[in-house]
Amino acid sequence: MRLTFIPSLIGVANAVCPYMTGELNRRDEISDGDAAAATEEFLSQYYLNDNDAFMTSDVGGPIEDQNSLSAGERGPTLLEDFIFRQKIQRFDHERVPERAVHARGAGAHGVFTSYGDFSNITAASFLAKEGKQTPVFVRFSTVAGSRGSSDLARDVHGFATRFYTDEGNFDIVGNNIPVFFIQDAILFPDLIHAVKPRGDNEIPQAATAHDSAWDFFSQQPSTMHTLLWAMSGHGIPRSFRHVDGFGVHTFRFVTDDGASKLVKFHWKSLQGKASMVWEEAQQTSGKNPDFMRQDLHDAIEAGRYPEWELGVQIMDEEDQLRFGFDLLDPTKIVPEEFVPITKLGKMQLNRNPRNYFAETEQVMFQPGHIVRGVDFTEDPLLQGRLFSYLDTQLNRHGGPNFEQLPINQPRVPVHNNNRDGAGQMFIPLNPHAYSPKTSVNGSPKQANQTVGDGFFTAPGRTTSGKLVRAVSSSFEDVWSQPRLFYNSLVPAEKQFVIDAIRFENANVKSPVVKNNVIIQLNRIDNDLARRVARAIGVAEPEPDPTFYHNNKTADVGTFGTKLKKLDGLKVGVLGSVQHPGSVEGASTLRDRLKDDGVDVVLVAERLADGVDQTYSTSDAIQFDAVVVAAGAESLFAASSFTGGSANSASGASSLYPTGRPLQILIDGFRFGKTVGALGSGTAALRNAGIATSRDGVYVAQSVTDDFANDLKEGLRTFKFLDRFPVDH
């Protein structure tokens, strides 16, 4: 089935959203409250504060635990030493099974604020009043790598959000890419087994550049759409703060009276989208594999709270096949030209976890955490996730009571007949754990659509048909939308996609797999397939135009749009302790940029007053812009190793690797970053072969308002794409 865009629908993008017109019904009985304070009040019940306290055993008795109990100073340790046994036993059992996927992650608390009363489209209480606040917890993650892998692996990135609503927990368990690799959850083990390390040698970690991954991709072409997104900048974002988020599946909104709409969830970063380039990501991974979790933590600690807007695309139940594809297919997007996004509210992350394990590691998200006003669809991937995400927690937590952990507890009372199990934290007072009953007034009572504000399934949902094991014919076209994505990228980002696929398949050993990859790419775009083929030693194919089209859609790339905020970006000023003007210049620049949330870091040969870090600990990957200070140009002389030792090379120093200052400048330019120089520091640009006439290169005699404004504009551009060669 070929994706066909309906021209008459394009005008919808400019229409006023019908769900934001007129006076909406109010739910005045719901109070706002201070969601941030509520989070602290709730979690503080579970804090353990060791300040000014004596060491105790797990049962509270004061102890000392620095030496084992032995029979004499040189004798054997005694089995009766309960202090030793407790300490070692607890250490032996500290680890729990890591997540099968999304093991590597970072989280933060925050607040969601509703933009209005949306009770005309959903009965969800957290969207029932303008200004209503709801505590949230978000966990960002990679998918394939283990808990100890790098943040910078090329991967889909998880974006899971929990709303602690006044009607229970609601989770949007999404990603930073709006589609997924497979259409049916029964293929999930096959997908993950294919992308995980080999079973014989556990290689490679957190990478798909190997035979089994691309063998699966080329045999299961539903993967192509997500694959192209992952090979683009979306696979290697600048930070968690600079990604959008998506619910992936189509869900339902349901009103109090049972009317339903189909919706797709979108998180739009109010920082803007930004990505690294591949070599930059690889270097960052080697130098600081915690780069992204550190960026998120540091931004929140500095009070630069990242924000996202939550929106939905709203469609009628009858629209499931309207756009030329199936809304139940999780490998498809709904272009915003077809259905604009209705903004529902804003989320701000403003509080770091106090303990990583207790909060970020123990939090469990699942798409089955929904509330009144939200309902599922028949998306076969979603249906399978509803089982898998709940089931896996039994393995991770060793029992069914994981919802009782503080990070997982709802902020409202829990009343049901579930009892006992390992790790039961509560003391139920109702001895009659069954329903229906006459005791205790029949409590807990049944809540439904009309009584008790209970959850209810959309009344209009129906289904019929024969029992089959088959893919719906409406799911069959898996090439038109990958082409839509590829068509919509700017030339440089198309090149990044091509280079990424070349890199991955250059590591594939099987010529059969490589050839199959080219067959699938050729169904998307002949130029894409040919450019990859010639780099990996496969014959260039003739066009296979069945699914070719020239359609494009907006805002699917990570390049070509400016950042909305500069919060937490870093400018590295490359100076010298031999020239005090370096410190003065960095200080002046810091004053000019601080109101925009930009950090200025002065780098010099050694630590001294005003110097933030040394060249020995610095690389271009740490900065979003690089500026050479006046007087530091002697450190940037082009090094030569012919006919002499490293000590005799120009610009050499025993304080840092030879040529490090010049390398920082060159790499900054190569990675598309803003670069600049002050006064005599422009000589460093010449030594690096960087023309001052290039876009994103700024020079001035001293730090002026114009120079600072140029740097800010360069930071908003983020990557200057003319520095990256494109195939011809």
Swiss-Prot record:
GO process terms (BP): cellular response to hydrogen peroxide; cellular response to iron ion starvation; hydrogen peroxide catabolic process; response to oxidative stress
Keywords from the named record: Cleavage on pair of basic residues, Glycoprotein, Heme, Hydrogen peroxide, Iron, Metal-binding, Oxidoreductase, Peroxidase, Secreted, Signal, Zymogen
UniProt superkingdom: Eukaryota
Catalytic activity: 2 H2O2 = O2 + 2 H2O
Entry's EC annotation: 1.11.1.6
Residues the entry annotates as binding heme: Y389
One GO MF term: heme binding
Gene Ontology CC terms: cell surface; cytosol; extracellular region
First and last residue of the signal peptide: 1-15
UniProt xrefs under InterPro entries: Catalase, Catalase_AS, Catalase_clade2, Catalase_clade2_helical, Catalase_core, Catalase_haem_BS, Catalase_immune_responsive, Catalase_large_C
Record propeptide residues: 16-27
One Pfam family of this chain: Catalase_C
SUPFAM superfamilies: Heme-dependent catalase-like
Principal place of residence: secreted
Glycan-linked positions: N120, N448, N551
Subcellular location: Secreted
Assigned protein family: Belongs to the catalase family.
Record function comment: Occurs in almost all aerobically respiring organisms and serves to protect cells from the toxic effects of hydrogen peroxide.
Subunit: Homotetramer.
Name used for this protein in its record: Catalase B
Organism: Aspergillus fumigatus (strain ATCC MYA-4609 / CBS 101355 / FGSC A1100 / Af293) (Neosartorya fumigata)
Taxon lineage: Eukaryota, Fungi, Dikarya, Ascomycota, Pezizomycotina
